[in-house]
């Protein structure tokens, strides 16, 4: 039996050569046309008369440009007119989905924008990133181009892939004139992006006070929360340290007690970002001082950690609780001790802060001072509170030789024992604190004394216990 005839291979050499020659010809024609567009409309006309297509596609670095797109981008008005007359497709786009109108709008070529829309260019054609010509004109502050687009049907509230509108993009840039134009053309003021940011948020984040004021006059919501962190404009402004914007928002009735998803209020945001001028304004503006976030941290805790004595004083004068605890059981005094803030610790003690409170891990403020390594704070907190012998054992276990010496000078019994019947020497030996061991031996402690399980300091130093 005879076999059926084989189909010719689609990738045969003759066809491949033909495709290559066509491709090479188009590339050569595009190069000639591109050079002509940069030269003059007459030069372009000569090539079109020679049969080169007005809808030829650019290759490689020209990302699928058409002659009309390229002429619109560089602002060659006469060439744009010619190409339209010779049949150029007005709404063709490049490989990024950008039309001739998109490129003209991006570069502020107003006369070309006007010509294109009169000849049917779609003002709402979107790029692959879902951006419109109006967005590009706004970003680049091309007011005349914006006006033409808006009068010819551009959607003022179109949102890109991130949910941003032209109004938001103008707000990001702080461009008052562009924003005014968009608002006068009916831009929706409280539209939110995918993460919940409005145009007012954008203005606040970048410290554009005049825009914030303008948005408020047009009905911008000053207490609206964004979606991810649930922060308000006031929290964002406080964290960024935009004090004039914070003052403005307060005058517009922004709520200083509104908190974000972590329970943080604007004042805490300012303190944690060390925006002290802003924090002072918020305190004077009536911010609550005893509010706790979801970790139990309050304003006094935050001001203490930030190390600002003046703000701690202001907060205490507002009747903040000097012995308040966070979820870890830490008081402001403990945090001052940990962070090495001596003057703040002194102020807290004068305001009635207790030395006796222990955190969830059984540590007092003095123990926090030991771990923080600040000798002056160790001295300050050494007197009062728990027995000196208990403090001596803790200091020895941490190897804080100066603290051990301080407690010995306060008549702590060097041979006092804890619940395991271990003394300070045993703890220092177990943890390898040689200098502390040497100091304690000078007190006459017996190196062969035993604790629980009959462990001696020497055994503990060798790895026992």
Mark where each language-model region is.
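Ankyrin repeat structural motif
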Residues: 40-48, 76-84, 109-117, 142-150, ...
């Amino acid at each position: 039996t005879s076999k059926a005839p084989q189909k010719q291979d689609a990738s045969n050499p003759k066809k491949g050569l033909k495709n290559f020659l066509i491709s090479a010809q188009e590339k050569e024609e595009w190069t000639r046309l591109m050079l002509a567009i940069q030269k003059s409309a007459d030069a372009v006309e000569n090539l079109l008369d020679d049969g080169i297509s007005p809808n030829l596609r650019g290759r490689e670095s020209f990302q699928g440009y058409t002659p009309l797109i390229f002429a619109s981008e560089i602002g060659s008005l006469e060439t744009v007119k010619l190409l339209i007359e010779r049949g150029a497709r007005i709404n063709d786009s490049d490989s990024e989905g950008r039309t001739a109108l998109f490129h003209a709008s991006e570069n502020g070529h107003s006369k070309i924008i006007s010509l294109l829309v009169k000849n049917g260019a779609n003002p709402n054609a979107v790029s692959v990133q879902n951006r419109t010509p109006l967005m590009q004109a706004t970003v680049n502050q091309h007011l005349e181009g914006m006006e033409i687009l808006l009068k010819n049907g551009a959607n003022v509230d179109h949102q890109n892939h991130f949910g941003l509108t032209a109004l938001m993009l103008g707000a990001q840039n702080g461009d008052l004139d562009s924003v005014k134009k968009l608002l006068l053309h009916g831009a929706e003021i409280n539209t939110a992006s995918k993460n919940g940011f409005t145009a007012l948020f954008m203005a606040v984040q970048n410290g554009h006070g005049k825009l914030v004021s303008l948005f408020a006059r047009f009905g911008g919501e000053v207490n609206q929360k964004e979606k991810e962190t649930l922060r308000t404009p006031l929290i964002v402004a406080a964290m960024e340290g935009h004090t004039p914007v914070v003052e403005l928002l307060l005058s517009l009735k922004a709520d200083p007690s509104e908190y974000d998803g972590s329970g943080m209020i604007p004042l805490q945001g300012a303190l944690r970002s060390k925006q002290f001028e802003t924090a002072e304004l918020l305190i004077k503006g009536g911010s609550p001082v005893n509010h706790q976030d979801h970790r139990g941290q309050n304003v006094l805790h935050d001001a203490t950690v930030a190390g600002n004595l003046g703000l701690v004083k202001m907060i205490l004068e507002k009747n903040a609780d000097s012995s308040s605890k966070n979820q870890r059981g830490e008081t402001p005094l403990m945090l001052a001790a940990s962070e090495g803030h001596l003057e703040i610790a002194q102020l807290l003690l004068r305001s009635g802060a207790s030395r006796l409170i222990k955190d969830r891990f059984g540590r007092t403020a003095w123990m926090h001072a030991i771990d923080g390594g600040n000798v002056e704070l160790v001295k300050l907190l050494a007197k009062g509170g728990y027995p000196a012998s208990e403090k001596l054992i803790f200091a020895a276990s941490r190897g804080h030789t100066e603290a051990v010496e301080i407690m010995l000078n306060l008549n702590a019994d060097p041979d006092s024992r804890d619940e395991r019947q271990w003394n300070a020497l045993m703890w220092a030996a177990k943890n390898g604190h040689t200098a502390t061991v040497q100091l304690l031996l000078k007190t006459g402690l017996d190196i062969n004394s035993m604790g629980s399980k009959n462990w001696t300091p020497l055994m503990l130093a060798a790895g026992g216990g």
